[in-house]
């Protein structure tokens, strides 16, 4: 059996510590500094998720700030759109599979993708498309087209318990003996909901776990919010003789409950801090609509000999992408609070008055 190597597994460092006071003036000074430095010190990153929601700034203030941070950058504009309330992503046709790095391949059905980390001892697959048919008819042939042997898939790391990410996992387990990995909270979610194509419970992912296969180590971080057990990995990516550090953000759309959005915000802050320490300079998403993913694949495909790789955004670019996630989440939380306030005010205005005495 291909058990994950756990000798290097350790929890990620705690992000707790003293929280400096933050005035409204300081709030916007930090925002201005972030726009110039593109991620040197995240806006409000030193506040807790709960405390950040007490500001008088409106949801639209946050949305405007996110748009300002994005500017004309299509990668950043994509995540602003993806986190905007009411956004409905397009369903483009599936692109041809592509090695976006020497050791990283993407096989996509257009609106959701699987990412293969190619190692000296086989494949670590991140997500498995929508269903067994897509795994068999798109994922497996796509890997073969890129010179990767699907029979060497050793692990399927499922970022979260939604069908468009786990759908093909059990097929890969049954066909190739791959081990399926998911955070405990999302294994529990599958057990509760019992959705179609759910994989049989296999390996739990610990926060900060290091999964080593051959010459490659992938670090798996718990980033709950999109679901209770969302996971986001760091991975090495080789390009033109240099090894970079990439990340894949495991969940996109904010959940309905305000408390879950606050959890999502806390995860984004923690993950961005870990990214800084790891010098992450590559940003990926399992949903290409959230980061201009399909377009960047075509840029790379059309210029295969270019020294530049559009997925290498630099440490500041990766931080700015996460800064926009943070800022949009603050806006979504503020919008929830505004809706609650409006409802309370309306009820108070229409409720009958009680007697004033006796």
Question: Where would I find each of the regions flagged by the language model?
Answer:
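N-terminal secretory signal peptides
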Residues: 1-22, 33-41
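C-terminal regulatory/interaction regions
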Residues: 2, 28, 32, 58, ...
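Zn-dependent metallo-beta-lactamase
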Residues: 42-44, 48-122, 132, 356-358
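Active-site HxH/HxHxD metal-binding segment of metal-dependent hydrolases
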Residues: 56-68, 104, 133-137, 143-210, ...
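Conserved beta-strand hairpin/beta-sheet module of binuclear metal-dependent hydrolase folds
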Residues: 90-146, 150, 232-253
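Short Gly/Pro-enriched turn/cap motifs at secondary-structure boundaries
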Residues: 95-96, 105-107, 200-202, 222-226
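Short catalytic-loop micro-motif centered on adjacent basic/acidic residues
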Residues: 106, 125-127, 155-158, 220-222
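Metallo-beta-lactamase
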Residues: 123, 130-132, 200, 210-212, ...
């Amino acid at each position: 059996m291909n058990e994950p190597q756990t000798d290097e597994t350790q929890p990620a460092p705690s992000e707790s510590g003293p929280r400096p006071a933050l005035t409204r003036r300081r709030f916007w000074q930090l925002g201005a500094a972030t726009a110039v430095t593109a991620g040197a010190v995240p806006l409000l990153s030193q506040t807790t998720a709960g405390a950040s929601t007490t500001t008088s700034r409106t949801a639209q203030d946050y949305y405007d700030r996110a748009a300002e941070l994005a500017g004309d950058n299509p990668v950043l504009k994509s995540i602003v759109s993806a986190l905007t309330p009411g956004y409905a992503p397009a369903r483009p046709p599936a692109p041809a599979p592509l090695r976006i790095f020497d050791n990283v391949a993407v096989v996509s059905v257009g609106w959701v993708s699987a990412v293969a980390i190619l190692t000296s001892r086989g494949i670590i697959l991140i997500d498995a498309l929508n269903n067994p048919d897509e795994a068999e008819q798109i994922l497996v042939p796509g890997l073969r087209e890129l010179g990767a042997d699907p029979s060497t898939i050793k692990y399927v790391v499922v970022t979260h318990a939604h069908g468009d990410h786990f759908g093909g996992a059990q097929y890969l387990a049954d066909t190739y003996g791959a081990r399926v990995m998911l955070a405990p909270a999302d294994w529990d979610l599958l057990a509760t909901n019992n959705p179609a194509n759910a994989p049989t419970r296999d390996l739990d992912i610990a926060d900060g776990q290091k999964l080593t296969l051959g010459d490659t180590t992938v670090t798996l971080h718990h980033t709950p919010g999109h679901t209770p057990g969302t996971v986001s990995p760091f991975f090495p990516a080789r390009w033109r003789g240099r090894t970079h550090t990439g990340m894949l953000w495991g969940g996109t759309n904010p959940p309905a409950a305000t408390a879950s959005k606050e959890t999502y915000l806390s995860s984004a802050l923690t993950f961005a801090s870990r990214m800084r320490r790891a010098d992450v300079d590559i940003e990926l998403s399992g949903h290409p609509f959230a980061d201009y993913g399909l377009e960047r694949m075509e840029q790379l495909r059309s210029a295969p000999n270019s020294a530049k790789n559009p997925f290498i955004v630099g440490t500041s670019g990766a931080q700015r992408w996460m800064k926009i996630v943070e800022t949009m989440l603050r806006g979504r939380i503020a919008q929830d609070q505004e809706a609650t306030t409006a409802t309370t005010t309306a009820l108070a205005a229409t409720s009958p008055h009680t007697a004033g005495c006796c």
